[in-house]
Amino acid sequence: MPSFAALLPVILLGAGAVTAMLAAPRLPGLARWIAGFALVAASVALALRLGAPDGLSVLLADDRMSRLTGLVVCLSGIGSLAFLRPDGPSKEGPALLLLATLGGVVLTGAVHAASLFLGLELITLALVALFVLPLDRPALEAGYKFLILGAAAAATLLMGLALGHAATGSLALEAFGGREALLTFAAALLLAGLAFKLALVPFHMWTPDAFTGAPGAAAAFAGAASKVAVVTALVRLDAVGLPQVWALGLGTFAGVSILLGNLAALRQDGVARMLGYSSVGHAGYIAAALATGAASAPAAALFYIVTYAPALLAALCVAALIGRATRISDLRGIVWRRPLAGAAMAAALVSLAGLPVSAGFFGKYVIFTALIEGRAWALLALAIAGSALGAYYYLRFVALIFRRAPDPADPAVRWPERTLLGAATAIILLLGIRPDLLLDQIRAALP
């Protein structure tokens, strides 16, 4: 049985969600502060135990990897909380965000079918509610697509878990390694269910609508925190030794996602929609690394998604500030109107493009290294082509950011958004100079 200290982050997030939900109808401002306190407290609890001895229960692993990625999920949750405005329509937003974060923390430590499914569905159901809270047409459309596709993905995942249990007699994920026919079908269904959460082609249709129609907090969490948790689950399953169809499927999804995601993003003039389609390509890079089976692939996948999270949060924050229906021309001269927002957007886009000196540069480097180590030459060629396309359309936006415009200065940015933009930019630049600070932690966390 895990110790109280190991369960403390889960307890804090669960208790915070219930308390924030009770406070929301009459004291929505207090609900935001409760959510912020619970997220910070859970982050501190995870950070203080990073170097603690590993533990294991039937449902959850209490190891360094779950603590590190759980910490990133909580920090991304704090960043997503900055998108919730006190005067917004979402009184229940803080509580729902805590529930989604709780699901992410559970998923990072999942070693059993029950905890895997529970973590994924906590994230999905909380995000569905967050998506539709504004109750306008774009939000309802985004929520509807996410709900329908999420239900199909959940059914697919459950069927995979059921077949795995039928083949092995166990619901522990480590028992799913093998070459039996039933396990082959189980691995294929598991991959399809998780591919939806990671937004791999052809399960990506919800992503552009989520980034443009859903509230900023929901889009930020779906794009950053939830994907950190899902990649952690993929890394754990990848280590089990699943049938060959797992690697084959990952490689196929990866190649198509890199190509179609970047080509679709290339044609977008809207900031948020471009970020939505490009996130499909970024998911493809991660899947490509894991498909190789290279020794460095798990560390590369985790490093990439962790460095991707602050860049996406910063870019979505700026997109929310200027209006997520904004077109590329509306970014013209933003660095002169809102210096912090413009600088943060430029740093985020440079990192997403994988250019020096940014965290994203080393993210691309470790992915390419894993592809070379695994001799996945076709995937490497697609990844290089996708990166070149990405650099082109990201730099299109960056060029406009610094172009002088006669528009007057915009209103000041609120302090939660200033804090998010400043912290995200600092992380992007710090990891662009010292990637070893994170990479060493990830390598130490892997078995």
UniProtKB/Swiss-Prot annotation:
EC number, as in UniProt: 7.1.1.-
Entries under Pfam families matching the protein: Proton_antipo_M (PF00361)
Chief localization: membrane
Annotated keywords: Cell inner membrane, Cell membrane, Membrane, NAD, Quinone, Translocase, Transmembrane, Transmembrane helix, Transport, Ubiquinone
A GO cellular component entry from the record: plasma membrane
Bilayer topology term: Multi-pass membrane protein
Entry similarity comment: Belongs to the complex I subunit 2 family.
Complex formation: NDH-1 is composed of 14 different subunits. Subunits NuoA, H, J, K, L, M, N constitute the membrane sector of the complex.
Full protein name: NADH-quinone oxidoreductase subunit N
